[in-house]
Design a protein with these regions (language model features):
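N-terminal secretory signal peptides that target proteins for export/translocation
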Residues: 1-3
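Asp-box/BNR beta-propeller blade signature and adjacent active/binding-site loops
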Residues: 23-389
């Protein structure tokens, strides 16, 4: 998280494509779809939910395509990046042609929206942001701050709530600062907790959110921690550390509750050869067992419960051949080391792709959303419909 193409209308064409390249019998690729593409914008980092009436809502981060302005490249940090949304009423095949604005932060630079739909229909949308400071101001900021690109200062996390299906959103709500975090905002205040990744609502109604914290700037080191809400996301309490290490950093974590009640954090790693990692709690989130590598590369991960309680684990693959991959795990996620890999996409153009987020469509189909680019193309929001066997 901290390391961090075609007319102007939505391209929502359903492209029939071959079945998965893997021999895995449990999942078969049906088709790829374009969810949102526009040559004026770099569109990325989607999340998706299905509303009670079957409507799909995808939130994503959109920023101006700097290449169209004759600049040398696009960044993942931009003063004009906003949270946008599109909707589908036909199972993800076609999407609303004009995206709706979910939120534009007053200080700019909104990132990676993470949607969670609660059982009562309430929507949460997490994000984090960057504030852009002119060169004469940066040296005068109270330290320590995190500067990504020149002048872009990390501002921490926030989230939005909606009780009407995303038609209207609350003003930003700010999670608590956690003690492990050393960074300050550009205004000299403690950083609010932040993360890019899926939250989950547990069987008892509590919401689990694994957030990141910068423990050290030199050398850079990031750990993860669990926050819990018992009031539908109105407030949060710190629970415990999730994963930390003297050399390896962890961030961009999605959290999942198994039928048995284990809480599993699926972790992106840094300085660990891009290996997917996980940590497990067997006491309801009071503590976590030591983190472990999962034996394969890819990031970040998203876990989705299937109708039969198996788990679809999806992840971006930024190694050749570039694309999107998945595994179907057992209900308790104990067979990650042996579950066959499913290749959803292997036609990526550059490594600026991935970040999948999935949703169940019906008893036998799933939509996997992600951002993608093909050779010579611009980043756009896409998806793959997968048949589950």
């Amino acid at each position: 998280m901290l390391s961090l193409r075609p007319p102007f209308v939505l391209l929502a064409l359903a492209l029939l494509s071959p079945t998965s390249h893997s021999a895995e019998p449990s999942g078969r690729k049906v088709r790829d779809v374009v969810i949102y593409a526009n040559p004026l914008f770099h569109s990325a980092f989607p999340s998706v939910v299905q509303r009670p009436d079957g409507e799909l809502l995808v939130a994503f981060r959109r920023a101006p395509n700097r290449l169209a302005l004759s600049e040398g490249h696009n960044n993942h940090v931009d003063p004009n990046s906003y949270i946008m949304g599109v909707r589908s009423r036909d199972g993800g095949v076609t999407w609303t042609p004009t995206p709706e604005l979910i939120y534009a932060h007053p200080f700019g630079g909104s990132q990676d929206p993470g949607l969670l739909q609660l059982r009562d229909g309430t929507l949460l949308c997490t994000s984090y942001g960057w504030t852009f400071v002119r060169p004469d101001g940066v040296p005068k900021l109270k330290a320590p701050v995190l500067e990504n690109y020149p002048g872009s200062i990390f501002n921490g996390g926030y989230y939005l709530r909606s009780t009407d299906g995303g038609k209207q959103w609350s003003a930003p709500l700010y999670p608590p600062h956690i003690d492990a975090e050393i960074l300050l905002t550009p205004y000299g205040k403690p950083i609010p907790a932040y993360n890019r990744g899926a939250l989950t609502e547990g069987k008892d109604g509590r919401i689990f959110w694994v957030v990141a914290a910068c423990d050290s700037i030199q050398p850079s080191k990031i750990s993860t921690h669990l926050l819990i809400s018992s009031d539908h996301g109105l407030s949060w309490q710190y629970s415990c550390p999730v994963a930390g290490d003297a050399k390896v950093s962890f961030n961009e974590t999605s959290v999942y509750e198994t039928p048995r009640g284990d809480i599993i954090a699926f972790l992106r790693s840094e300085k660990y050869e891009d290996q997917a990692c996980m940590a497990r709690s067997i006491d309801g989130g009071k503590s976590f067992q030591p983190w472990q590598g999962m034996g394969f590369q890819g990031h970040p991960l998203h876990a989705l419960r299937l109708p039969d309680n198996r788990v679809l684990l999806t992840y971006g693959y930024r190694h050749k051949p570039l694309g999107i991959r998945a595994r179907i795990l057992n209900a308790e996620c104990t067979d990650f080391a042996t579950a066959p890999e499913i290749v959803l996409r292997d036609d990526g153009g550059t490594s600026d792709l991935g970040y999948p987020w999935s949703v169940v469509l019906d008893a036998h189909h799933v939509l996997v959303t992600y951002y993608f680019n093909v050779p010579g193309g611009l980043q756009h929001v896409a998806g793959t419909i997968l048949e589950i066997r």
